[in-house]
């Protein structure tokens, strides 16, 4: 545990602009850089090699890992925009090597000991809003002006196009690709390309899957699953039952588990349908 004097000494050794306002109880690694007029509050912990841009605001409780780049005027860790919030000591937790661009807002969770969580190696472009209790896993790209409502969960390596909105409690599957300006009001299945208002599953996200290193055999299995779910004459329930028989492939198995949970899980909104 750092003493107050050691914290003050550490602050003197960091690269902090003289106009920045740092709470004396904030914990900044000596290699942290803080730009002009940034404000860092109490109960903030920031890891090594992280940079905080000019006019950024970071309030706690929050933990930020190593190597993050937080650009000017980002606002992170303020209380949620949720009428149920009653002043609880909720959290934001951010992993390592994220890029958080200008005017991004990331709100704390609503209830005590709950967390809004950002993983590692993510890119949040300018004006992205991450509401209370959201979870963003790893290697996610979110383009400009995307708004995530509360409790949205984005799995690893999803790509979210610009200027779209995501309804509360929606889950976006791994390696999914969401087209810009779409309305995402149901769960977006993993590995799929989704677009439109209302949004529909259009195709497999083949480019993203190839970049992720899936084999030709994996892609063939997912193509069969896609045709079964979105191009057959079966009802969705019937197609899901047939899909279970194909789930000897790990990616098809995950797709099946995701869709099953989407239709039966608590507070689930169901999966986005196909274009037909």
UniProtKB/Swiss-Prot annotation:
The keyword Ubl conjugation does not apply. It catalyses: a (3R)-hydroxyacyl-[ACP] + UDP-N-acetyl-alpha-D-glucosamine = a UDP-3-O-[(3R)-3-hydroxyacyl]-N-acetyl-alpha-D-glucosamine + holo-[ACP]. Signal peptide: none annotated. Pfam families: Acetyltransf_11, Hexapep. One of its GO terms (cellular component) is cytoplasm. It is found in: Cytoplasm. GO terms for molecular function: acyl-[acyl-carrier-protein]-UDP-N-acetylglucosamine O-acyltransferase activity; structural constituent of carboxysome shell. SUPFAM superfamilies: Trimeric LpxA-like enzymes. GO terms for biological process: lipid A biosynthetic process. Pathway: Glycolipid biosynthesis; lipid IV(A) biosynthesis; lipid IV(A) from (3R)-3-hydroxytetradecanoyl-[acyl-carrier-protein] and UDP-N-acetyl-alpha-D-glucosamine: step 1/6. Homotrimer. PANTHER family: ACYL-[ACYL-CARRIER-PROTEIN]--UDP-N-ACETYLGLUCOSAMINE O-ACYLTRANSFERASE (PTHR43480), ACYL-[ACYL-CARRIER-PROTEIN]--UDP-N-ACETYLGLUCOSAMINE O-ACYLTRANSFERASE, MITOCHONDRIAL-RELATED (PTHR43480:SF1). Involved in the biosynthesis of lipid A, a phosphorylated glycolipid that anchors the lipopolysaccharide to the outer membrane of the cell. Belongs to the transferase hexapeptide repeat family. LpxA subfamily. This is Acyl-[acyl-carrier-protein]--UDP-N-acetylglucosamine O-acyltransferase. The gene is lpxA.
């Amino acid at each position: 545990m750092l003493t107050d004097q050691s914290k003050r000494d550490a602050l003197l050794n960091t690269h902090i602009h003289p106009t920045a306002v740092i709470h004396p109880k904030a914990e900044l690694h000596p290699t942290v850089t803080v730009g002009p007029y940034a404000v860092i509050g109490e109960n903030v912990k920031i890891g090594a090699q992280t940079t905080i841009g000019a006019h950024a605001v970071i309030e706690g409780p929050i933990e930020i890992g190593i190597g993050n780049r937080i650009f000017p005027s980002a606002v992170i860790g303020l209380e949620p925009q949720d009428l149920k919030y009653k002043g609880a000591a909720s959290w934001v937790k951010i992993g390592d090597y994220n890029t958080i661009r200008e005017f991004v807002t990331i709100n704390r969770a609503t209830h005590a000991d709950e967390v809004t969580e950002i993983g590692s190696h993510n890119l949040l472009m300018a004006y992205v809003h991450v509401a209370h209790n959201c979870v963003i896993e790893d290697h996610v790209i979110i383009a400009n002006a995307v708004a995530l409502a509360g409790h949205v969960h984005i799995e690893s390596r999803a790509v979210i196009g610009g200027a779209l909105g995501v309804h509360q409690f929606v889950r976006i599957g791994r390696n999914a690709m969401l087209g810009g300006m779409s309305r995402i009001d149901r769960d977006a299945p993993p590995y799929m390309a989704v677009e439109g208002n209302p949004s529909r599953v259009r195709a497999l996200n083949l480019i993203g899957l190839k970049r992720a290193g899936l084999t030709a055999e994996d892609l063939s299995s997912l193509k069969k699953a896609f045709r079964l779910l979105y191009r057959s004459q079966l009802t969705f329930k019937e197609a899901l039952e047939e899909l279970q028989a194909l789930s000897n492939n790990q990616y098809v198995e995950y797709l099946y588990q995701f869709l099953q949970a989407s239709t039966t899980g608590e507070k689930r909104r169901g999966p986005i349908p196909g274009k037909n």
